[in-house]
């Protein structure tokens, strides 16, 4: 297994927390170009690292992004996502606004919502069985 999927250590934790994040532009417009995506990937990677996380995979279509992330358990997922959206929006507005402004209305780039799911580890049924089968003390 690759190093990126191994256990990570924090100051007081050992963790393996992976998430699949999907971000969409406002109104799910088809706005992304290859040039934008080539610039967004290292920006997202750097932003994750600044917050103690890790960008493991980056993929996209014209109207949405897929990111596989490792986020430390001490970090708020909503704050983490907010930082990713904020820095990327700032970049896109600064460098590509002329290309996208006609496809969006108003001043916002990202939809206010996002989709995130935890991933990796054992299937839920296996974890459930493991927890159920713990030996409780008889006292």
Report the location of each language-model feature:
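Basic nucleic-acid-binding interfaces
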Residues: 1-139
């Amino acid at each position: 297994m690759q190093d990126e999927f191994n256990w990570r250590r924090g100051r007081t934790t050992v963790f393996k927390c992976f998430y699949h994040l999907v971000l969409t532009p406002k109104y799910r417009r088809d706005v992304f170009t290859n040039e934008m995506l080539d610039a967004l990937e290292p920006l997202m990677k750097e932003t994750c690292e600044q917050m103690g996380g890790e960008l493991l995979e980056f993929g996209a279509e014209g109207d949405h992004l897929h990111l596989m992330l490792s986020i430390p358990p001490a970090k708020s997922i909503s704050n983490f996502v907010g930082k990713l959206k904020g820095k990327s929006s700032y970049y896109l507005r600064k460098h590509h606004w002329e290309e996208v402004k006609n496809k969006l209305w108003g001043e916002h780039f990202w939809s206010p919502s996002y989709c995130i799911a935890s991933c990796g580890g054992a299937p839920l049924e296996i974890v459930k069985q493991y927890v159920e089968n713990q030996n409780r003390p008889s006292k």
